[in-house]
């Protein structure tokens, strides 16, 4: 009896029919394709894109040169140099992020005690040569200034989960 069952399964191509059933189900299902440049999918407030350095409302940069982000970066993509000010506080003289090395894990953002470094929703950036994707302090501050309103909204939406 078992031999007959096995023969019928192989003769009727039972596995092939099961596969065709799955194919047919997805063939007539609604499509989920997004035509990227014209259409964009919604992004989460927690999206980790291009980095930015933030400023306080009075215009002073937030980074206190504690170097926690540099220490926690698993890809060693962050380079920080700092100096002591006359009033005894430390400030960065150099803050570079190599986006080629960066794995966008968000550890730098979590480690920062003053929310100076954040990851924005900016997904589209490019460079023509390798050095174009090393963002300096000035470039990161410019990104932060440009997207501060969106960053503040995302931080407020994420606040209950922090």
UniProtKB/Swiss-Prot annotation:
Membrane topology: Peripheral membrane protein
Entry keyword Repeat: yes
Required cofactor names: [4Fe-4S] cluster
Location within or outside the cell: Cell inner membrane
GO molecular function ontology, one term from the record: 4 iron, 4 sulfur cluster binding
An example Gene Ontology CC term for this record: plasma membrane
Co-factor binding comment: Binds 2 [4Fe-4S] clusters per subunit.
Catalytic reaction(s) noted: a quinone + NADH + 5 H(+)(in) = a quinol + NAD(+) + 4 H(+)(out)
Main subcellular location of this protein, as a coarse class: membrane
EC number: 7.1.1.-
PROSITE patterns in UniProt: 4FE4S_FER_1, 4FE4S_FER_2
Binding site for [4Fe-4S] cluster 1: 63, 66, 69, 112
4Fe-4S ferredoxin-type domain boundaries: 53-83, 93-122
PANTHER family hit by this protein: NADH DEHYDROGENASE [UBIQUINONE] IRON-SULFUR PROTEIN 8, MITOCHONDRIAL, NADH DEHYDROGENASE UBIQUINONE IRON-SULFUR PROTEIN 8, MITOCHONDRIAL
Primary role: NDH-1 shuttles electrons from NADH, via FMN and iron-sulfur (Fe-S) centers, to quinones in the respiratory chain. The immediate electron acceptor for the enzyme in this species is believed to be ubiquinone. Couples the redox reaction to proton translocation (for every two electrons transferred, four hydrogen ions are translocated across the cytoplasmic membrane), and thus conserves the redox energy in a proton gradient.
HAMAP family found in the cross-reference section: NDH1_NuoI
Subunit comment: NDH-1 is composed of 14 different subunits. Subunits NuoA, H, J, K, L, M, N constitute the membrane sector of the complex.
Record's protein name: NADH-quinone oxidoreductase subunit I
UniProt organism field: Nitrosomonas eutropha (strain DSM 101675 / C91 / Nm57)
